[in-house]
Amino acid sequence: MPAAPRAASASPAAVAPGSDPVVSIDSLDMEARGVGRLVNEDGTPGKVIFVEGALPGETVSYKSFRRKPSYEQAHLLEVRRESVMRVKPGCKHFGVCGGCSMQHLDSRAQLAIKQRVLEDNLWHLSKVRPEVMFRPIAGPDWGYRYRARLTVRYVAKKGGVLVGFHERKSSYVADMTSCEILPPHISAMLVPLRELVTGLSIRDRMPQIELAVGHEVTALVLRILEPLTDADKDLLRAFADQHNVQFWLQPKGPDTVVPFYPLDRELAYTLPEFGIRMPFKPTDFTQVNHHINRVLIGRALRLLDVQPQDRLLDLFCGIGNFTLPLATQGRSVMGIEGSEALTTRALANAGYNGLAEKTEFACRNLFEVTAEDIAALGRFDRWLIDPPREGALAVCKALGELSQQGSDVLPQRIVYVSCSPATLARDAGLLVHEAGYRLAGAGVVNMFPHTSHVESIAVFERR
């Protein structure tokens, strides 16, 4: 029979029958939960305990809500010994709202933990270590989220509408009156939005509001399951005039999104360092954090070390977020994107910014690309890869095959921007172990402060 586990921070007699169990927290997992391990009576390692809200260095009591043979998931009851990294959360809804998971952790410690997550993934998944760890890219901790999807829920018992993020690990909508990670003007609009939707005839047929903040325009996309009445339209127009926003309507899928009022506005963000303005639709993919996006572009271009004669390739190019800045520095750039709508937008943005002659765009499924497809593109001096969470597996496999064939189309340098340390690690393993690259450097990009999301950037150099 296996020995019964006891708390790692206490002797067997220290935990009296019926009292709350105690554990020492050693680390955080990918969901920002504290991780500790119990010790069996015979001194052997026991179960791993995941405690929501606990921090490394703390001793906490907990209550388990899910028990498995090798681990337990638990709620935090009391902090017996507090970490020096613990701070007071900046939002009154923290702990209930699921939008943030790390507000109780000092911002510098957040960066250090994310950097460790990146390093651990690279080593444990692919046995790769960067030659240099870059200083984290960081910016303002509050008011940074310029894109968000808010859930709308009519609650008859409460006599009104809730507008906000989901509660933590729940389908319920948090009763939010403000949000510190949204821009201040959006945070101040949450209560008026609730009042607006409550007054609409379709208040129980509007499940979602998607917001996108541009340089001059704030767009609100209303997901409507029934047509608006004339009275509804009057309310929306009045609200738009009062709060200086633009309403868009989405009756069905994302392709059905159309502007409603006012119609004389253009949603766009700017990249002033490059003299670029990027018009976009509110449902297009754009980075949520404008400040970090600008810093990230600058670092990516410096790491690529673009020369005036270089021919450049931008994979998963979206609306041209990296493509157009690259075009201001290299001889020419080809952008490839899997979405036809985004490819069309990128082409239009190149023309809008006077860069059409230096850019070329194509719509391709990069998740199914082959070595033959890559070879057919010809040689580019430098690549930028910015895939979604799924990563760039097919692309990196193709590079490995081409390397083993002795092909001369492989670029000298690749900068890889990632929103998943696990898929970056997987792809880095292919580039290093099969395609003949070395991982010259990597670092985290704090695109989402106070969340466990880890964005990163890495540079690969051909050996």
Curated annotation (Swiss-Prot):
CDD domains in the record: AdoMet_MTases
InterPro entries attached to this UniProt entry: 23S_rRNA_MeTrfase_RlmD (IPR001566), MeTrfase_TrmA_CS (IPR030391), NA-bd_OB-fold (IPR012340), SAM-dependent_MTases_sf (IPR029063), TRAM_dom (IPR002792), U5_MeTrfase_fam (IPR010280)
GO molecular function, one term: 4 iron, 4 sulfur cluster binding
Annotated keywords: 4Fe-4S, Iron, Iron-sulfur, Metal-binding, Methyltransferase, rRNA processing, S-adenosyl-L-methionine, Transferase
Transmembrane segments annotated in the record for this chain: none
Enzyme superclass (EC): transferase
EC number: 2.1.1.190
Keyword Transferase (UniProt): yes
Binding site for [4Fe-4S] cluster: C91, C97, C100, C179
Binding site for S-adenosyl-L-methionine: Q287, F316, N321, E337, N365, D386
Matching Gene3D superfamilies: 2.40.50.1070, Nucleic acid-binding proteins (2.40.50.140), Vaccinia Virus protein VP39 (3.40.50.150)
Record has rRNA processing as a keyword: yes
Domain TRAM, first and last residues per copy: 14-78
The reaction(s) this protein catalyses: uridine(1939) in 23S rRNA + S-adenosyl-L-methionine = 5-methyluridine(1939) in 23S rRNA + S-adenosyl-L-homocysteine + H(+)
GO-annotated biological processes: rRNA base methylation
Entry annotation: catalytic residues: C419 (nucleophile)
Function according to Swiss-Prot or TrEMBL: Catalyzes the formation of 5-methyl-uridine at position 1939 (m5U1939) in 23S rRNA.
Family: Belongs to the class I-like SAM-binding methyltransferase superfamily. RNA M5U methyltransferase family. RlmD subfamily.
Protein name as it appears in the record: 23S rRNA (uracil(1939)-C(5))-methyltransferase RlmD
Gene name of the record: rlmD
